[in-house]
Amino acid sequence: NYEQCKLISKAARKAGKIVCVCHVLRYHPAFIKVKELVSSGRFGRIITITHTEDVGIDRTTHSYVRGVMNTEAGNNPMLLAKCCHDIDFITWLTDANCRRLSSFGGRVWFRRENAPEGSATRCCKCSVEQTCPYSAVDLYWRRRQWINNFDVPAGKTIEQVITQELEEGDYGRCVYHCDND
């Protein structure tokens, strides 16, 4: 929130450090071209923009269901957590402040009452894991996706870390049996 941002800024000044949010989309060649075209008036005046951020099911289950952003208390709204760069791009593109913004969604599907019959609390012990589109075993072990977030200590292999995470860690939990709110 705003008060927390002021505290971060004060701490940075006290430590002689700089804190900045980098909105890198402004500097991508494709977006620069879009900005040039819009600014030229070639397409007329922009009246409204509809923008969709497709987070994707793998990222959703990794970050917002099993992961560190799985509770409202430990997270920011999706617009801030995932879309601040998009919002910056749109305001930069249009040279205007936003008048109205809508965001739709919620944490309504990954709940115990929606769990498949026979599901277990951990994917590696689940009888429906092979057919589950949200399988942690498939995501991390078979496809090796999102494993760059796993810390691999000296003397351990990534395979050992994935196995331990699947058997004991947050990322091995069934999406329907997590503590996300």
Range-by-range predicted roles:
Residues 1-26, 41:
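Beta-strand-loop-alpha-helix segment that lines the small-molecule cofactor/substrate pocket
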Residues 17-18, 25-171:
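Predominantly a Rossmann-like dinucleotide-binding segment in NAD(P)-dependent oxidoreductases
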Residues 177-181:
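Glycine-enriched catalytic-core subsegment of oxygenase/oxidase enzymes
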